[in-house]
C-alpha cells in the first residue's frame, strides 16, 4: 500500500512539469495564431490600399494620354499583344479569305499537321501507317 502511494506521488512529481509545459505551449500557440491573424489582416489591408493606388495611377495616366479605350471592362489596362499589330491583322484577313475561297487553310494546315496531313507533325508517316 505504501509503495502504491509513493508510486502515485512520484508519477505526479514527474508529470507536473510536462503538464505545465504543454499548457504553456498551448497558450503560446494561441498567441502565435492571433499574431499571424493580425499580421495577415494588416498585409491584406496594405495590399488592397496599394492596389487601389496603382489602379488610380493607371486610370489617371490613361486619361492624361487621351486614351479613348481607357480601362477595359474587367478593370485592367489593355496590354498590347502581337495580335494588335496591323501587319498580323492583315495576315489573318488574307488567311481568312483564302480559307473561304479555297476551303482549306493550306499554309497553317501544312505547318500544323506536317507534310502529308497526319496529326503527328512532320513524322513522315501516312495516316494508315499511324494505326499499325
Curated annotation (Swiss-Prot):
Which UniProt keywords are present, listed alphabetically? Answer: Glycoprotein, Host Golgi apparatus, Secreted, Signal, Virulence
State any GO CC term: extracellular region
Q: Which residues are glycosylated?
A: 116
Induction description: Expression is up-regulated in spores.
Q: Which residues cross the membrane?
A: none
Tell me which positions the record assigns to the signal sequence.
1-21
Summarizing the function annotation, the protein's role is:
Secreted effector that does not suppress pattern-triggered immunity (PTI) in plant host.
- Description of its domains: The RxLR-dEER motif acts to carry the protein into the host cell cytoplasm through binding to cell surface phosphatidylinositol-3-phosphate.
The name under which this protein is listed is: Secreted RxLR effector protein RXLR-C22
